[in-house]
Design a protein with these regions (language model features):
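N-proximal low-complexity "stem/linker" segments adjacent to membrane-targeting elements
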Residues: 1-25
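Short, acidic, metal-binding catalytic loop of nucleotide-sugar glycosyltransferases
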Residues: 24-33
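Short aromatic/hydrophobic "clamp" motif used to bind/position activated sugar donors
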Residues: 84
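Glycine-rich, basic loop-to-helix element that forms the pyrophosphate-binding segment
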Residues: 62-79
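Conserved donor NDP-sugar-binding/catalytic core segment of glycosyltransferases
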Residues: 95-127
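A conserved acidic beta->alpha catalytic loop
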Residues: 40-49
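Short, flexible, basic/aromatic active-site loop/helix in glycosyltransferases
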Residues: 124-148
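A short, conserved alpha-helix in the catalytic core of glycosyltransferases
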Residues: 150-153, 157-162, 168-195, 201
Length: 274
């Protein structure tokens, strides 16, 4: 696959340690840094100095934290590739993760696709795990269920529904609004077991909560953000019920067939499958 087929972007805000781990995993597995666009949302630690040492495809330094939606749009618009991969910076990638992600999307006519995830502490051999997991679950899909830790978006999607809501006060609700618009437009999307990431766990949001004196369980966004979806109470409730039912069904089927699922959490040195 030609690297010009895709462009990768992530936003960062402080927590330079996790950005370094992410970039190091790119280098380790041959993901070209000239296809990576980093948008720094006003970091005050060593993040900016570090980014300036890298041979990136582009780097944008915002004066203040403009939120995910603005940053993701800024990054996606730099190289304007056929596929834009929007991801968190607190992740580790695995061998052939981009190729597996996009090849699976093409084979299944998907326009938005996310990789499978392990979340929590990285207290296991992730590379060894993914060699087995990506082969075992390469043909498995959770249709209609991508996630914002990482998503590859085909260029046709931007033309159909537009980009992310560029509203800083949303504080993390941008992905919900984007997926809602995609579902309304009938855009095919899924999570695949052919590509895997390790996700340390919403490090940027945790940093912003700490600065604002919020508890971990508290949300950053406004409690009435759901109004932006223009959904009735009943529609929201039915959609949530369907999602819970689907997640339960996927978990049951995947455990029965593979002894694992496409979403795991590390807890007490073991995997908890969701």
């Amino acid at each position: 696959m030609s690297p010009s087929t895709y462009s990768i972007t992530f936003a960062c805000y402080n927590a330079v340690h996790y950005t370094k781990l992410c970039v190091d995993s790119f280098i380790k597995h041959g993901t070209p840094l000239d296809r990576l666009i980093v948008v720094d949302n006003g970091s005050t630690d060593e993040t900016r100095d570090y980014l300036q040492t890298l041979p990136l495809g582009g780097c944008i330094f915002n004066k203040q934290n403009l939120g995910c939606g603005v940053a993701w749009n800024q990054g996606a618009l730099v190289q304007q590739a056929e596929w834009s991969i929007i991801m968190n910076n607190d992740v580790l990638v695995s061998p052939q993760w981009v190729e597996s992600l996009i090849d699976t999307a093409k084979q299944n006519n998907l326009k938005i696709i996310s990789p499978a995830l392990i979340e929590g502490p990285q207290d296991y051999d992730f590379d060894e795990f993914t060699q087995v997991a990506s082969h075992k679950m390469k043909n498995t899909l959770r249709m209609g269920n991508p996630h914002a830790v990482c998503l590859a978006v085909h260029e046709s999607v931007w033309m159909d529904i537009g980009y992310f809501q560029a509203m800083p006060k949303l504080w993390g609700y941008e992905d919900t609004m984007f997926f809602h618009a995609a579902r309304k437009a009938g855009i095919p999307m899924a999570t695949t077991g052919s590509s895997w990431l390790h996700h340390f766990g919403s490090i940027t949001q945790s940093e912003m909560k700490r600065e604002r004196g919020l508890q971990d369980k508290q949300g950053l966004g406004g409690r009435h953000n759901y109004r932006y979806l223009n959904q009735s109470w009943l529609a929201r409730k039915l959609q949530k019920r369907e999602k819970v039912r689907n997640l339960k069904s996927w978990r049951t089927q995947e455990l029965a067939q593979y002894g694992m699922t496409m979403h795991g959490v590390r807890k007490n040195g073991d995997f908890k499958w969701l």
